[in-house]
Each structure stands twice: as structure tokens, then as C-alpha cells.
């Protein structure tokens, strides 16, 4: 699976009483599907995944799969503390035709990986390798400031044939460059469209379906009855592309520098409230218009810094830009009055 371009980490909408608001989630996804984003990250860190039950997790995964455009790459954030529970959700995501799963450090090991104990690192490696061995979907590793996968571990895991890449919200451009340099020998073939965009599982399914055409009885003769005739299905034209280990940059402040370091795309939390503005950084870089790319990057920074201070801030920024944000689920809190006023001012220049 090709991980290139902008991938939007979704927020999770709730009703005022804390229940999931699935209609608003579906509406957000439909709107994101009309943006230039290449994919959607469901229940990443900004989606409040640890505050959902497994049943709610399934409801969210199902709603997104039913609402997203077939061309959107879908990545399911399904990390659980046990391998067994994670694989159960991986199987569910596979049944919904997701394209990959997002898996990070289990909470049992948070804060211990960088200690002097080799046992904790061994447990992490066993956890991630076992999931990659048994998952029906490819794995994207997840690392951020609170749950950092060590670079050495990332490089070792990159060789696994079922691990596609890394979404890292904390890696500096120099660290991304180091990871890619140390994994440069890894080469894989992926299926892409004729214009080198990702071919998703749901695109393959859609290509196998076509609406029936009604053939009248009159056209068939007096003794015939009307029938539905399925027209030939237009083929999904594809080609192959050779790729290496793929990195999605999760740090909004360093999208451009991360792309320059070799990242294949971006998946920053701020994209949930300003997908067009984030995409414009990637587009200008892709067109090699470096002055424009730097200008687009600079205009993101102040608003992103405040919006990414917590799910409540990010959701309010979504509200300001035409997406449903709403309140976070307790114990998380909405932004203060002063934060709301500051976000209103900062988001003015980033309206879609």
C-alpha cells in the first residue's frame, strides 16, 4: 500500500452527554473525502481511542468505512495492550476493507522502553512482530512524544514484510532521515493507479460492481419479461511502483522539513481542522516550489501549536472550519475562554 500525500487523523465526535455521534462522524468523513487528502487515519492519538470501548471502536471503524470515498486509504488505529485483542480488531478492520492498521507501544510498556532493562524492549519487539506476523492487514507503526518507538527498534521492524511504514508525531527531520538511510535497502512492489496513486481495497471492490441496466420486455420480444442486465465492469487500470520503508510525518511544525528529509507524506493532527492548508504544503513541495512551500508551512505553525494542545482545542478548531468537533469525552476538557478567542483569531487565515 502506497502511503503518500496527506492523511487526515480523524477526531471522534460525541453528543453533549458523551455518547458517540456517528452521524456527525459520517458527515465529517464525507467532507474530508472531497478534500485533496489521500487517506484517513481512524482512531489515531487525536481520536481519543483510549476513551472508547471495543464496541464503540467497531462502530467508529464501520461508520468511517461506510462513509469514505473508495479512493481514500483507510488506516485503523486499533492498538490494545494484548496481542489477542489487537488482532481481533485487525480482523474486524479487514472485514471492512481497511488498508492498514496503526499499532504503537502498549500502555503496559509506556515509559519503560528506554530504560536499562532489555526485557521491556524485547516485549515491545515481540508484541509488534507477533501482530505483524498474524495481522490480515499491513501494519503502520505509530510513535509519538509519549510513546516513542526507539529508532533502532523501528529500523529492525522495518524489515518485516507486513510492516509498511511509520507514522511519527515526534521524530525530527534528522531522525526521519536517519531511519530512511538505515532502511534504504528495503524495496517493495505496490499496486498503484496509472497516475501513481494508491489502489485501496475498496477501489478493488468497487471495480467489481456496476449498476444494473433495465432492459424492457418490449425490446426482448412479446414473450419476454423485463430484466436487469449488468454492463461490463470497467477495469481498474493499475501498475506497480517500487517503494521503500515509508514515513508519514506527524509533526505539523516540521511537515516541510520532514518531506525534504524523505517522508512520503504527512499525518498531523492539525489536518483534521485545516486539511487544505496542510495539503498545500505537500503540494508546493511536490511541485518543487520551495518558496511557496515555506510560506505555506509558516502560516500553519501558530494555529497548529495551540490547536494541538489537546483534543478539546483541536475539536474547537474543527468547529471553526466547518467540521463537527464538539466536546472531548471526559475527563478531557474543552478549551478555556482565552484559548477559544485565540483559536478564533488564528484560524481566520486558514478557513477552507
Where does each model-flagged region fall?
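Generic alpha-helical structural context detector
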Residues: 8, 283, 315-319
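Active-site beta->alpha loop and helix N-cap motifs at the rims of alpha/beta catalytic domains
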Residues: 1-149
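Glycine-rich tight-turn/loop motif centered on a GG-T
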Residues: 49-54, 106-122, 190-194, 199, ...
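C-terminal extensions of enzymes
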Residues: 308, 312-352
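A non-catalytic, amphipathic alpha-helix used as a structural packing/dimerization or gating element
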Residues: 24-31, 59, 63, 284-287, ...
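A general structural signal for well-ordered alpha-helical segments in protein cores
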Residues: 25, 57, 61, 86, ...
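Catalytic alpha/beta core domains of metabolic enzymes, predominantly
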Residues: 130-134, 145-299, 304-307
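Conserved, mostly hydrophobic/aromatic
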Residues: 18, 32-33, 64, 93, ...
Amino acid at each position: 500500500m502506497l502511503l503518500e500525500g496527506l492523511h487526515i487523523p480523524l477526531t471522534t465526535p460525541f453528543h453533549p452527554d458523551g455518547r458517540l455521534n456517528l452521524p456527525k462522524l459520517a458527515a465529517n468523513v464525507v467532507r474530508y473525502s472531497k478534500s485533496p487528502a489521500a487517506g484517513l487515519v481512524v482512531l489515531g492519538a487525536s481520536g481519543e481511542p483510549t476513551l472508547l470501548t471495543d464496541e464503540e471502536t467497531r462502530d467508529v471503524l464501520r461508520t468511517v468505512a461506510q462513509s469514505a470515498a473508495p479512493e481514500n486509504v483507510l488506516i485503523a488505529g486499533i492498538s490494545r495492550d494484548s496481542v489477542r485483542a489487537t488482532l481481533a480488531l485487525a480482523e474486524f478492520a479487514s472485514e471492512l476493507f481497511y488498508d492498514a492498521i496503526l499499532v504503537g507501544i502498549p500502555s503496559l510498556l509506556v515509559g519503560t522502553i528506554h530504560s536499562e532493562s532489555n526485557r521491556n524492549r524485547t516485549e515491545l519487539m515481540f508484541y509488534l512482530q507477533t501482530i505483524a506476523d498474524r495481522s490480515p492487514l499491513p501494519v503502520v507503526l505509530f510513535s509519538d512524544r509519549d510513546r516513542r518507538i526507539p529508532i533502532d527498534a523501528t529500523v529492525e521492524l522495518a524489515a518485516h514484510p507486513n510492516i509498511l511504514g511509520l507514522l511519527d508525531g515526534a521524530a525530527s527531520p534528522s531522525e526521519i532521515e536517519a531511519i530512511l538511510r538505515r532502511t534504504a535497502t528495503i524495496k517493495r512492489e505496490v499496486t498503484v493507479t496509472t497516475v501513481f496513486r494508491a489502489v485501496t481495497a475498496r477501489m478493488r471492490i468497487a471495480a467489481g460492481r456496476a449498476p444494473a441496466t433495465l432492459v424492457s420486455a418490449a425490446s426482448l420480444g412479446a414473450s419476454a419479461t423485463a430484466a436487469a442486465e449488468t454492463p461490463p465492469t470497467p477495469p481498474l487500470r493499475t501498475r506497480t511502483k517500487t517503494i521503500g520503508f515509508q514515513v508519514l510525518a506527524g509533526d505539523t511544525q516540521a511537515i516541510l522539513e520532514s518531506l525534504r528529509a524523505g517522508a512520503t507524506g504527512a499525518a498531523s493532527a492539525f489536518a483534521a481542522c485545516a486539511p487544505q492548508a496542510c495539503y498545500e504544503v505537500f503540494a508546493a513541495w511536490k511541485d518543487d516550489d520551495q518558496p511557496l512551500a515555506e510560506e505555506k508551512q509558516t502560516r500553519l505553525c501558530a494555529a497548529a501549536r495551540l490547536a494541538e494542545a489537546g483534543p478539546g482545542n483541536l475539536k474547537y478548531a474543527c468547529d471553526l472550519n466547518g467540521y463537527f468537533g464538539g466536546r472531548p469525552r471526559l475527563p478531557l476538557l474543552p478549551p478555556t475562554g482565552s484559548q477559544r478567542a485565540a483559536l478564533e483569531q488564528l484560524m481566520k487565515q486558514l478557513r477552507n
